[in-house]
Amino acid sequence: MEELAQAGVTHVLDMQIEFDDGPLAAPHGIRVLWNPTDDDFLPKPSELLQRGVDFALEALDEPSARLYIHCAAGVHRAPMMTLAVLCAMDWEMEAAMVLIERCRPVVDFADVYVESVRRYVSSRMESEPRASE
């Protein structure tokens, strides 16, 4: 956690179920959302993704914020959440996936997780008020 603090990270979105980073981050003043997620290749609920997106977008509203999204290996869960965050920021899904893969080449976008993000984005769009309303 010291390394993250030295890199200027202010917020951690922790997707690993194995361990809560909160106690390690507190002495460094880093805010943590522990959003424990099994890497079980089962569909993930939109509520799980929304919780992470809410935390990320609130963090990114702060001009000096640096957000770090992670899981245990950085292969499935963190990329899924990063994809949800970027889509919530109006990125096209395919472009977001390309960016994530460019930054983290070991990413494996499991179909079930990508579909979970698609469902989340779709439900988000349905719940947002339309400009004509």
Language-model-detected regions and their locations in the chain:
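Cysteine-based protein phosphatase catalytic domain of the PTP/DSP
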Residues: M1-R66, C87-V121, M125
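A phosphate-binding catalytic loop at a beta-strand-loop-alpha-helix junction
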Residues: S64-L83
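Structured catalytic cores of enzymes that bind and process phosphorylated ligands/cofactors
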Residues: Y113, S132-E133
